[in-house]
């Protein structure tokens, strides 16, 4: 299928795997790179998260997308804050765990 995409002018190929090792995507990249040396290959290592970016590059990948790690990290923190607010009826107890509003606003251009 990837060869067909390349034939019709695709700009790059993103491959994903539900397996917990990169073996499947490395096998694909080895075969794909024989015929397509310059088409960008994109990896999304959500399940095979022990693989390093260096290993991906050595196996022919050009782009790595960490598609959901930030969301998965944020959810437990948000859950903890919500539980504390419900328990205490206020947010004072979680202030120590929160970024200051001023710091958040500084992230937005033009709000300093």
What is each of the regions a protein language model found here?
Residues 1-66, 72-84, 111:
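Alpha/beta enzyme core
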């Amino acid at each position: 299928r990837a060869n067909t995409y390349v034939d019709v002018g695709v700009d790059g190929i993103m491959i994903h795997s539900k397996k917990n090792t990169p073996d499947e995507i490395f096998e694909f990249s080895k075969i794909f790179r024989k015929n397509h040396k310059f088409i960008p290959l994109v990896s999304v290592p959500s399940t095979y998260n022990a693989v390093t970016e260096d290993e991906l590059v050595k196996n022919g990948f050009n782009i790595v997308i960490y598609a959901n790690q930030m969301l998965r990290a944020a959810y437990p923190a948000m859950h903890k804050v919500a539980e504390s607010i419900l328990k205490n009826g206020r947010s004072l107890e979680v202030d120590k765990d929160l970024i200051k509003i001023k710091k958040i606003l500084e992230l937005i251009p033009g709000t300093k």
